[in-house]
Amino acid sequence: MITTLDTQPQEWMESNPNAFHTIAACTFDNIEHIEYWINKLVPKNRNGEFVKWSSGKRNVRYRDIFINNCIKYVNEIDFYVNCISAKAGEMSWIAWSFYMQNQNHIRQEKDRKGRNNLVFQITEEKSIAFPVLRAGFLIWYYYALKYLSDVKKIKGKFLSDYFASDELGPGEGKALGAAFVNFLLKQSNLDIQISLPTNERFKNLDRISDYFCGWVNSIRNLSATKENIEKFDLLSNKNPMIDGFIYIPLLTIIDENGTDITSEIMRKVIEGSKINGENEQN
C-alpha cells in the first residue's frame, strides 16, 4: 500500500480560530495504481500538463472536471480516500494539552519574534522548537496518521509533500516538520513513517489527494458551491471507500490533585485564541 498525503491550507495558521484545515489521505495498491487514476480523474491544461486544484485562472473549470470525473467513475474507484479536518482554534488546544501532558519533555520559550514557542527535547543534546500553533498542527497531523493506522488499518508507505514551513533537505535542520511528525510516530511504536518525494515521479503522485483536499476543505470552510457539496455527499454515500470527517483527538488533562481540568483549560485556550487573534504566518 502507498498513501499520498496533502494538506489545505498547507500548515499556515490563520488568525481565524474557526478556519478549517484538512488532510487528504489517498491509499492505493502501488505507484502504477496511483498513476492510472491520475490519468483517469485529474484534468490537464492546453499543454497537456496535469493541473492542481489551485492552479491557473481556469481553476474553477478544472475543479469541476475533476469532481465530475469522480462522479462518472464512482462505482469504479478502488482506492481509499480519507479527508480529515479540524479547526485552527482546536489545534491551539491540542498543542497546549499535549504540552501539559508532557512537561518533562517540553518547555516554553519566546523566539526572536516574540512568539511563544514549544521546545521539544528529542535527545539529551537535541531539541526542536515550533510556534505554538504550528506545533498544534503538527501534533494534530500525527494524531490523524495514528487514527488512519489504528482505526482505518492503513499501513505501508506514506508519501507527503514538504510542509509549508520546512526547509528543503536533506541535511541537519531540514524538513523539521516532517521529521517531528516521524519522531512522534516512532515514539508511539507505530509502524509508519512519512516519506518525502525524492524524484519527479514521486513529486507528481499527490495530484488526487491535492484535489480531494481542496474539495473537502472548501466544503468545511463554506466556500464550496451547493452543487459541489452535494456531489461529495453523493460520492461518499455511493462508495464506502471515500470518507470525510472532522477529527479531534480526545486528550485529557489531570492536575496534581488528580482532578480532570480538561474543560477548563480548553475553554481558556479557545477564548485566548479568539481574543489574541493568533497568527503565525510570519
Language-model segments: which ranges?
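Phosphate-ester processing/binding pockets and catalytic centers
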Residues: 2-282
